[in-house]
Amino acid sequence: MPVIPYVVESNGREERTYDIYSRLLKDRIIFLGQQVDDQISNALVAQMLFLQADDPKKDIHMYINSPGGSITAGMAIYDTMQFVSCDVATYCIGQAASMGAVLLTAGAKGKRFALPNARIMIHQPLAGMQGTAREVEIHVAELRRIKQRMNEIMIEHTGHSLEKIEEDTDRDRFMSADEACSYGLIDKVVKSVDD
């Protein structure tokens, strides 16, 4: 069971205790700090929709430290990032791999960041499957459609050609923060909150 820190705020007459994620939400900060699955996806989607309703003109700040995970859960987060009218600024701390990298690069243009020692990894979608030959064929066709859509997203957010994206995602491709910036996955490497 993960340990969740709490913070206490007082305004003179009363004290309030928040779990750290609820407190960060007050400052429009959301956090993807685990593998992408339906549970974290639903939580992030709900937080973005709440922040959109609260103030549709203020940025949302999404911090990412994720090894990737479920494509469908990740696409729910991606679609919501594109759906809300607020800009979603993305920050890679630690790692953004696979679906985590897709979400990192899906941030608002000019507002995609990584800390200096962050690692970013892109690759083609992965899947394991079993069943009859026909069932496997159906899954392979779906995996090809997913790969095509992932490539379209990377093209849209990086400006690279389909050929380059296909070549670069054929196998795991790891990048430093500086390399990810040169590649177009992020806009800037930041060393402090003042950058």
UniProtKB/Swiss-Prot annotation:
Domain of life: Bacteria
Single GO biological process annotation from the record: protein quality control for misfolded or incompletely synthesized proteins
Localisation per UniProt entry: Cytoplasm
Coiled-coil region: none
UniProt keyword list: Cytoplasm, Hydrolase, Protease, Serine protease
Disulphide-bonded residues: none
GO CC annotations on file: cytoplasm; endopeptidase Clp complex
Transmembrane segments: none
The protein's name: ATP-dependent Clp protease proteolytic subunit 2
Species name: Rhodopirellula baltica (strain DSM 10527 / NCIMB 13988 / SH1)
Gene: clpP2
